[in-house]
């Protein structure tokens, strides 16, 4: 998840019915630099997912459904009006 402060950037949200699998601790909300570039790292290996935001680990979760997943990687923006998202320097590496 990438969202404004207070909305769990770095957490894992599944939009196909399960909702939040894991949200970030409140004390990590200030790691997000609003209005500036942020660096997000996502590592998925088997059923383990780890996320980092600006070098700080945000979550680490094991989930069988994620581990069974196959397919494509997509970048998604939800409706909400007035949101502008930019991506740069995307890198994907096979583990």
Task: Identify the residue ranges that each predicted region occupies.
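Carbohydrate-interacting regions of secretory-pathway proteins
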Residues: 1-95
């Amino acid at each position: 998840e990438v969202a404004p402060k207070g909305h769990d950037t770095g957490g894992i949200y599944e939009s196909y019915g399960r909702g939040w699998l894991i949200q970030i601790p409140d004390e990590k909300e200030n790691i997000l630099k609003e209005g500036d570039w942020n660096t997000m790292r996502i590592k998925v290996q088997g059923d383990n997912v780890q996320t980092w935001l600006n070098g700080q680990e945000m979550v680490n979760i094991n989930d069988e459904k994620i581990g069974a997943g196959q397919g494509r990687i997509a970048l998604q923006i939800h409706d909400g009006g007035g949101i502008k998202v930019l991506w740069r320097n995307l890198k994907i590496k096979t583990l």
